[in-house]
């Protein structure tokens, strides 16, 4: 055996022995003979005995619990990319975004220069009640300094059981000394429909961050409000939505389908086929709809988009989705740890499984697949999409493909016309984000008084921010390149302005600003305005990535690189 191969399989052998041994106990019969181990039963009994040998005879003391915890992820990683193990704390944290609430102080923060910076204070939350403000720096929590601490450890200091107290030491802009606020932790809502608004007098827009416990209820509230404002057509934005609860996606898409339409079905080796159909009670069955997707749209997002596409209920716009078509069932241990085991595949109404290809035990390659798409040009041209899967047909006979995500009806490539190496370096080093944060911090009160994204945008256009950024970049070892600065002016202004509006305003303000020149959103609105959201079977379907499709280009990939990561506590 090749030494490298042997080394690679050693952890797996330990993992198999540990995991199986935990489940089977010590059901074995053996004896020693001349240094050999003879085991009457084979397979699982053999590895169970191996565990016993390690525990009783290994040269050093072995912490069997640690061995189990380390081995769990390794053995599951050999099955498929989505079967996974979470320890007790990890299990709770992993579903926090999907719960309706958590217990904390009620702030969103980011880490800048090793300091906890409050981005926003949740209205009506514990922190707001005692006077914590956006822009505050949280320096201490009780007697613990938070300076230089990793974000996950900061969250553990700020979160806690409802009713418990934490004393915050805060440095406020314009003051020298720390100010102290004692916050009583409470229930903080987790919102997944984080923005909705009218783009014009007819077009509603809803942004869905994930599919959590309250997402369906939040969507109904958003739709009701938009309906009251005169909505006649709708854009649902699922870009970057990694999924969540399947039953929530089913409830949501049910609102748009006539009675008896197949939404999704699941099937596995030990899981009989189970179908989910629309009940005909949806209030928006005839509302024209366009769904925006991209490579970050996965799982429940693909169930939603697949049901709309296969039932020819609306138009899918954007780029090919992630391609997660496996169903995990959580199985909890007594200590609170959880195994999420893949037990079935899900299939869209046409019968396609959109799970992209993977090799067992090659999780890293699977995670790198999106980079491979980017490198082969798929983000820029629909011609680069590999349609090697089996062909399926929608309800009216349009051809769709399985085996690798959902290909949109209208492809919107990423735009690189204004891209330069100067902009790329500024974005990927975080300097755009840092500059926007510093500017926001210095001008927070003035910007907040403007109230709307439109007013903030008009104000920022007069501030000559491009020149200010170039000077800021020079102070941080980013060599000034005037020609590239001008070529990338549109990108710089878009993301500097966007970050500032995001820092000072709400998600709604931020998305309203971006939507005005976002090619995918513009294309979606054009489809709706022309009455083309309901697909029709064409005699000859236009090939994705055609010249017409390339007229609409998106910069969302670069946007994701420049927006600061925000944490909730």
Q: Regions from the language model: what does each represent?
A:
Residues 300, 312, 323-386:
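Polar, glycine-rich mid-to-C-terminal structural blocks
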Residues 1-8:
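Short, Lys/Arg-rich N-terminal segment immediately upstream of the first membrane anchor
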Residues 58-119, 165-195, 515-525, 533-543:
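Extended, small/polar residue-biased N-terminal targeting/export presequences
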Residues 52-57, 61, 70, 74-78, ...:
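Structured segments of extracytoplasmic/periplasmic soluble domains
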Residues 2, 20, 31-43, 47, ...:
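Cleft-lining beta-strand/loop regions that shape enzyme active-site pockets
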Residues 11-27:
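Hydrophobic membrane-insertion alpha-helices, especially the h-region
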Residues 353-354, 358-560, 567-569:
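Conserved functional hotspot residues or short segments at active or partner-binding sites
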